[in-house]
Amino acid sequence: HSTSRRQRQMCIETGYNIILKKPINIGIAVSLNDGNLIVPVIHDADKLNLSGLASQIDTLAAKARENKLAPDSIQGGTFTITNFGTFKSLFGTPIINQPQVAILAVGYIEKKPAVVETPEGDTIAIRHKMYLSLSYDHRIVDGALAGAFLRSIADELENWNA
């Protein structure tokens, strides 16, 4: 996972200390029916495969919308992901979920023309594209680290093998 290779994004800032968290606990922003937002946490997310993550997201989102989350289900997050794409937004600027130091926003996936390199030369083809947006606390995560983190996520998504 990109998150396990880029541990500094998994810190929390407590005012006087920066704590590097070993477990990767991913918060997922869930929009509630009343217009509010809550961030349940997938604990030890780095130990789950894609199917396990999807199952946890479905379970936590359903519990959140039914107002049945246990208190520990919304605590201990080390990094949050929000999906503006749910609302067909291409991108947005996410606000860091304190005391975490970074949050990733995923935009709407849409078909776009793209230049594709082939043995015969460049050609235009239709590809699925989306924007990623990372907000981070620059006191802890610098631009080089943030850029490398986004690049590693893009590389994994672009070379996905299901």
Report the location of each language-model feature.
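C-terminal catalytic/motor cores of large multi-domain enzyme assemblies
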Residues: 1-162
